Amino acid sequence: LIRRPLLSFLAPSRIFDQTFGEHLQESELLPASPGFSSFLMRSPIFRMPSWV
């Protein structure tokens, strides 16, 4: 059995394979839908922390 992350529908599975400290392309973090991605970027939960 292959276990998939709960939020795999929101983000590519590659994100969950990253080791801490690796950089991701911004395009990989954003979903395909432009309307949904603009909602995510406005949401304070999904903003990048200042220490990144």
Curated annotation (Swiss-Prot):
Gene giving rise to this polypeptide:
CRYAB
Oligomer and partners: Homodimer. Aggregates with homologous proteins, including alpha-A-crystallin and the small heat shock protein HSPB1, to form large heteromeric complexes.
Protein name per UniProt: Alpha-crystallin B chain
Q: Does Ribonucleoprotein appear among the keywords?
A: no
**Similarity field:** Belongs to the small heat shock protein (HSP20) family.
| A GO MF label | protein homodimerization activity
Q: Which UniProt keywords apply?
A: Eye lens protein
Protein's job: May contribute to the transparency and refractive index of the lens.
Identify the InterPro entries for this entry.
Alpha-crystallin_N (IPR003090)
